[in-house]
């Protein structure tokens, strides 16, 4: 799936708020960089942390609630 399609799907998951999406992706990418496990299936070893975070949001595996709670 192309990045534009993933982004559109992620935006739908969080109510079409680009600010919230950027906040979620940035915080989750930071957590992934610090050793958190990816919540998506498949080989993520060659993916950027931001791409993994975006896919997690698009698949509904993570949202703003998890970021606010500090998960």
Swiss-Prot record:
In the record, the note on similarity to other proteins reads:
Belongs to the RNA polymerase subunit omega family.
Q: Which NCBIfam families match?
A: PRK00392.6-2
- One GO cellular component term, please give it: DNA-directed RNA polymerase complex
Q: Which reaction does it catalyse?
A: RNA(n) + a ribonucleoside 5'-triphosphate = RNA(n+1) + diphosphate
Membrane spanning residue stretches:
none
- GO MF terms, alphabetically ordered: DNA binding; DNA-directed RNA polymerase activity
Xref: Pfam families: RNA_pol_Rpb6
Arranged from A to Z, the UniProt key words for this protein are: DNA-directed RNA polymerase, Nucleotidyltransferase, Transcription, Transferase
Q: What is this protein called?
A: DNA-directed RNA polymerase subunit omega
Query: Recorded E.C. number(s)?
Result: 2.7.7.6
Q: Which SMART domains match?
A: RNA_pol_Rpb6
Described purpose of this protein according to its UniProt entry:
Promotes RNA polymerase assembly. Latches the N- and C-terminal regions of the beta' subunit thereby facilitating its interaction with the beta and alpha subunits.
This protein's assembly is summarised as:
The RNAP catalytic core consists of 2 alpha, 1 beta, 1 beta' and 1 omega subunit. When a sigma factor is associated with the core the holoenzyme is formed, which can initiate transcription.
Q: Which GO terms describe its biological process?
A: DNA-templated transcription
């Amino acid at each position: 799936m192309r990045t534009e399609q993933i982004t559109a799907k992620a935006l739908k998951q969080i109510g079409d708020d680009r600010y919230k999406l950027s906040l979620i992706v940035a915080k989750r990418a930071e957590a992934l960089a610090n050793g958190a496990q990816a919540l998506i299936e498949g080989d993520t070893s060659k993916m950027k942390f931001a791409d993994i975070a975006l896919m997690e949001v698009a698949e509904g595996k993570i949202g703003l609630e998890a970021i606010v709670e500090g998960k």
